[in-house]
Amino acid sequence: VYEPYDELSLLVRMHADGFYDKEVVASVAGGYKADCAGPDWARLVQVFQNPSLQLASFTITEKGYALTDLAGETLPAARQDFAAGPDAPRHTMSIAAALLYRRFQAGGHPIAMVSMDNCAQNGKKLREGVFAAAEAWERAGLVPAAFLAWLSDEKKVTFPWSMIDKITPHPSEQVKKALEDLGLQDMTISRTNTGTLIAPFVNAETTEYLVLEDAFPNGRPPLERAGVYFTDRATVEKAEKMKVGTCLNPLHTALAVYGCLLDYSSIAAEMADPDLKALVEHIAAEGLKVVEDPGILSPRKFIDEVLNERFPNPAIPDTPQRIAADTSQKLPVRYGGTLQLSLIHISEPTRP
């Protein structure tokens, strides 16, 4: 989806009235596979050694940060990486640590490592993964202690937290056909060997939020001009908890489970069902009683937008079946915080 299209992609914003707002995304200068045995590795190392590099962002899903299995055992790829050192990394966290080691060797210029995955405390997850590899290498004598000291210096390396929100379903056949009807060619939707659907276009809703901890030791682009919120870590966490625990994800999961049971094929269709709409409105109302306001985003306005604009949008090809995946793992995060705060609220004595 990069080289055959001259590194260009097409963003298709899907409006509720059926209008497709199309924009060419031309911000990718080169696509390089992070494979230490592949032809792109030398170029990727060169990019990471460049003093002008300000940040590296990650969108690898929450599972991409995991170094252990459900039993707590180190994954085979990570175990091999820890023993082999920074010259032959395979796991994403080891690859990130290896590239940082190359930057350290080239002068140790500052950099921000920014996770933009949709999970709680994403910057912490990235930092822990990188440090797990680096510390294993240091214990084995494969990297000097000075590398760990450099990684630990927040004037040199940071791992900002972020909250990201934009419903972006799998590439849609309907969108593909609409683009082909306009004369665009080679809009093929492909499936990778891991099962991910990819295409030269991305279809998404119009709403978007990105809240970033402002911790960039080598400077940063003026992303606030594009609507990005910059703030401190505590506010990022409040915004993330607001979304994940109250204003969006719990409602999504409720619709997903009932949508599967009642054989719905879209979230928008569920929102046209009076009973299901009342269900998520009630869940939202309960959450609003205890949610902590992050200040930069209004929980009430956020939830009103979700219920009245985002979920009912019939143009979004989002299915309850997609959202229902891994529900058992999501329940503690999406409902646990609100339930815990509600119990505390109930147990507090009423003041006269």
Task: Give, region by region, the residue ranges found by the protein language model.
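Substrate/ligand-engaging "lid" and interaction regions
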Residues: 1-347, 351
